[in-house]
C-alpha cells in the first residue's frame, strides 16, 4: 500500500514538472513570434518612410511636369507673324527718300577681314523699309555680322550716333521646330551675340534682330518698330 502511494506521488511530481516546462516553452515561442512580428512591422514602416521621403506626391509630379522654361523655343508664345519683305512696307516706295548725308556715318570693316563698306543711317525706319533703303540707295542689304570684332565696330558707331538700338540684317524665319535665324543678304549664320535670355526668353517676340548700342548684344524686336539701321554696300 505504501508502495502504491509512493508511486502515485512520484508520478504527480513528474507531471507537474512537465507541465511547467511545456508552459515555459509555449510562452517562449509566443514571445519569439511577437518579436518577429514587431520586427517585420518596424521594417515595413522603415521602408514606407524611406519611400515617402524619396518619392514626390502625385500633385508635385504633375506640377513639375507642367512647369515649362521660358527659354524653350518650342514653348507656346505670342509672336509676330512672318511676313514677306515685299508686302511689309508701310508706305509706297516712292515716299521713301534716301537718307541725307548728314544723317549717315560711313565706315569700313577692320583690316584682316573682307573689306566692305557700311553706312549707319540715323533716320528711323521699320525693318523692311530699312532693307528697301539699303537696296535702293546703297545697292546692298541690312548688314550681316560674322565676328565679334565687327560687332564691336557697329556697336561703337551706333553709340556715336547716340541711339539705343539699330536694325541689323538678322531675321527669324519658319515656324515651330523649323524656326531659324537667317541674314537677309543670304550669307551663312555663323555668329551671334545674344543678350541674356535671348533669343527665346524675355517678352520680345519679334522676328527681326536689333543690336544694342550699350553692350553690343542682340535682341529680337517686332519688325514694324522704327529704328536706325546699318547697311552694307
From Swiss-Prot:
Residue stretches of biased makeup (Low complexity): 42-57
Keyword Signal belongs to the record: yes
Disulfide partners: 134-231, 208-223
InterPro entries: C-type_lectin-like (IPR001304), C-type_lectin-like/link_sf (IPR016186), C-type_lectin/snaclec_domain (IPR050111), C-type_lectin_CS (IPR018378), CTDL_fold (IPR016187), EMBP_CTLD (IPR033816), Eosinophil_major_basic (IPR002352)
UniProt KW keywords: Antibiotic, Antimicrobial, Disulfide bond, Immunity, Lectin, Nitration, Signal
Gene3D superfamilies hit by this protein: Mannose-Binding Protein A, subunit A
Name by which UniProt lists this protein: Eosinophil granule major basic protein 1
Organism encoding this protein: Cavia porcellus (Guinea pig)
Amino acid at each position: 500500500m505504501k508502495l502504491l502511494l509512493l508511486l502515485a506521488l512520484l508520478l504527480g511530481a513528474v507531471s507537474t514538472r512537465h507541465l511547467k516546462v511545456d508552459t515555459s516553452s509555449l510562452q517562449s515561442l509566443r514571445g519569439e513570434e511577437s518579436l518577429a512580428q514587431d520586427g517585420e512591422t518596424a521594417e515595413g514602416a522603415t521602408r514606407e518612410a524611406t519611400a515617402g521621403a524619396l518619392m514626390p506626391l502625385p500633385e508635385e509630379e504633375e506640377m513639375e511636369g507642367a512647369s515649362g522654361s521660358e527659354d524653350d523655343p518650342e514653348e507656346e508664345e505670342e509672336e509676330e507673324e512672318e511676313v514677306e519683305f515685299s508686302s511689309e512696307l508701310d508706305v509706297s516706295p516712292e515716299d521713301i527718300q534716301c537718307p541725307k548725308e548728314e544723317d549717315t556715318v560711313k565706315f569700313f570693316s577692320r583690316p584682316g577681314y573682307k573689306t566692305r563698306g557700311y553706312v549707319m543711317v540715323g533716320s528711323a525706319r521699320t525693318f523692311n523699309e530699312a532693307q528697301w533703303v539699303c537696296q535702293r540707295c546703297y545697292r546692298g542689304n541690312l548688314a550681316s555680322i560674322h565676328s565679334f570684332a565687327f560687332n564691336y565696330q557697329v556697336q561703337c558707331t551706333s553709340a556715336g550716333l547716340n541711339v539705343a538700338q539699330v536694325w541689323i540684317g538678322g531675321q527669324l524665319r519658319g515656324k515651330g521646330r523649323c524656326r531659324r535665324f537667317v541674314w537677309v543678304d543670304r550669307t551663312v549664320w555663323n555668329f551671334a551675340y545674344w543678350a541674356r535670355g535671348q533669343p527665346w526668353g524675355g517678352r520680345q517676340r519679334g522676328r527681326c534682330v536689333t543690336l544694342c548700342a550699350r553692350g553690343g548684344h542682340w535682341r529680337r524686336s517686332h519688325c514694324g518698330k522704327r529704328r536706325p539701321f546699318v547697311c552694307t554696300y
